[in-house]
């Protein structure tokens, strides 16, 4: 409370989650929330030890090696109140090349639906990202990829939360978001 949250950039997940955490903790969003832009995880590793930012909020499995071996320590978790990733396309692109967009979505959905069934995927991820095998296995057990578009209820809930946090000024009509 009242310290500087290191964020990758304004509008990023680390920035948005700082607001969610502040609200969860009952902080005054204007007085108790300050930011230091550090750009990336590498920036956090470099800048936080220098005092440029006091804490940061990043995906726990990505940062776990730096918690296990230093220089960071986990002080808590703050689950996202919305999906972590969505696919967004500009209206013009969707109008001009809907077939390609649908093909890309089919490929992504097929790949994510089958991802956990890839033989030794846990070992491949562990080796590629220098993560402990048991951490990758835990991540895989917790991670789900939706095969459906967000519902109007989900989008409305996210927008209401962003308005409440004063991160957007008003809700956008659902027809402009969901296609």
Each language-model region and where it sits:
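C-terminal solvent-exposed extensions
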Residues: 165-179
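A ubiquitous short alpha-helical element
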Residues: 6, 74-75, 144-146
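Secondary-structure end/capping motifs
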Residues: 95-169
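Bilobed "Venus flytrap"/periplasmic-binding protein-like clamshell domains
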Residues: 1-65, 123, 152, 156-157
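Short coil/loop linkers at secondary-structure junctions
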Residues: 23, 28-30, 72, 130-132, ...
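Pocket-lining segment of extracytoplasmic ligand-binding domains
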Residues: 35-36, 40-125
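Residue-level "edge-of-site" marker
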Residues: 61, 80, 139, 175-176
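A generic structural-conservation signal
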Residues: 31, 57, 76, 135, ...
